Amino acid sequence: MTQRPDCYYCSKHQTGEDPPPGGWLVADEDWLVGHGPAHMSLPGTLRIESRRHFTDFADMTDAEAASVGVLLARLYRAVRPVTGAERIHLLATMDFQPHFHAWLYPRAADEPRRGTAFLDQGFECTDAAAEAAAAAIRSQLAPATREGRG
């Protein structure tokens, strides 16, 4: 697996430092998924991180591209009932950390801002709220595994 010693994500995956609130929700061959850091997340915000070092969708292997689609579907199904989100926004820029990672931001129906205005507002929640959301999302993900849906 390709890793770069100067990369924040590669380093944290190797050392186990800076774990997500509530721990990893998904840890498979290609992906790690955890709740986003509380200081930049709404409760239920998830961050998907590639285990292999690459920058964007164009750099994915065919297997990674296929698996991320299945993973996203599972995550959307788990986040929506926990957060009550009307929409879940997917954001992946890699501008600050050039290692593939994507954010899932749940947007409530009563949130007046839409699209990029919603994403531009900045988010923050407590560590306790992030950990509680992670636990609830973990319980939503568990039945999908038992039923063979992912």
List each model region and its residues.
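HIT superfamily nucleotide-processing domains
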Residues: 1-150
